[in-house]
Swiss-Prot record:
EC number: 2.3.3.16
InterPro entries membership: Citrate_synth-like_lrg_a-sub, Citrate_synth-like_sm_a-sub, Citrate_synthase, Citrate_synthase_AS, Citrate_synthase_euk, Citrate_synthase_sf
Catalytic activity: oxaloacetate + acetyl-CoA + H2O = citrate + CoA + H(+)
Protein name (database record): Probable citrate synthase, mitochondrial
Main localization of the protein described in the UniProt heading: mitochondrion
GO molecular function, one term: citrate (Si)-synthase activity
Cited PANTHER family: CITRATE SYNTHASE, CITRATE SYNTHASE, MITOCHONDRIAL
Record's subcellular location: Mitochondrion matrix
Amino acid sequence: MRAVRCSLIRGVAGLRMASSALDEMKEQMLRRWKEDQKKIDDLRKKHGHEKLCDATIDAVYGGMRGITGLVYEPSLLDPAEGIRFRGLTILECQEMLPKAPGGKEPLPEAMFWLLMTGEVPTEEQVRGLNAELHRRADPEAIAAAQKAIAALPRNAHPMTAFSVGVLALQSYSKFAAAYAAGKSNKKTYWEYALEDSLDMLARTPTVAAMIYNRETKGQVELAAPSNSDLDWAANFAKMMGYQDEEFWECMRLYLSVHADHEGGNVSAHTTTLVASALSDPYLAFSAGLNGLAGPLHGLANQEVLNYLLSMQERVKADGVNMHDEAALEKALSNYTWELLNSGQVVPGYGHAVLRKVDPRYTCQRNFCLRHKFDDDLFKLVNTIYSIMPGILKEHGKTKNPYPNVDAHSGVLLQHYGLTEQNYYTVLFGLSRQMGVLAGVVWDRLQGRPLERPKSITTEMLAKKYLCNSL
């Protein structure tokens, strides 16, 4: 009887904490919105006709690379510092965001709070948000996603299953229901978008864990039940079947640092674009996942891992001692020059914007060093890191000879036995929802309109520029 009473007391306390945290999140958002709105009004009134960039013909044909055409609030990619989440660098986030007891990595819930509000949350606010997410993990909605995924062909890709699972959750969209009933308007869209975003964040870890067990065991089910005493990342890892608390800490890091990467990448822009039509967050994020599933966006870490595994096989085939640092450096240097001289690129090195080592790479490397990784793959990636920038500088055909986040993430997962490469993009998507959903909520809060850029044809460009030059 006492145990039941204590459980009820904890349950009531958890509800109060969750409700308080949500109220505080909304208050912080509205306070920032008022500050931002004055800036937006002044910018549009005083500088509305100022040019941000010139769109060249090369840029139009080149994937719009370099064209500044979006406002996206959660994050900004700094060429010198890497990604900044609401102005904070990766290192600052690691230092300032609340952590699990005894842990050193930021909790993803804390990262979500930062992206959504622009403020670093307190430990109490993070506990409240965690309680709120556990409260919103509706078994009925999750069962609908489970049923939809189970109906897929056995060979369906995990990203197909994730996108379908999110679409199945859409049946429970509060944004869509309120809009259909005429209960929402431009001033309240953001609140319904926030409701859907919190619900999605609460339910997708269970869906993603089911997809993992479908991939490894053939059954759309959990390896362990959800545990409301655990944080978001630890609970997800345990539902996948991982009991190692060091891996839970790894997941906290992985899910936090992949949370956003400004608004122009395929998954973020797709989510933003679809949501601009007042499609609810589920529809928008499912579309973003489909973009993330493309090999040019979400498969980079798999390509790096395949490259590393091929290097590992070649080292062994050539009889190189992995523990002889000088011999390993010499062999890898020779392999790299062969690759470059054949016209290929080194996977995991270089970045479209960054001009230094990706801080997301650095924090993953530091995690491995702190936890004393000693496996061959880590030795390999660490040795490549020591020689590659010098080789690429000498080669002279790359603007950024330093590693990006993808150069390390696969090694991290392989170390803990998560070897199912097809699943890696699901982890990426689970993390990335935090940033893109924060972007969607802020678009609705700021009253952002439907996206409708102008397109042009080759024939029209030819008539304008080529005919006059003949």
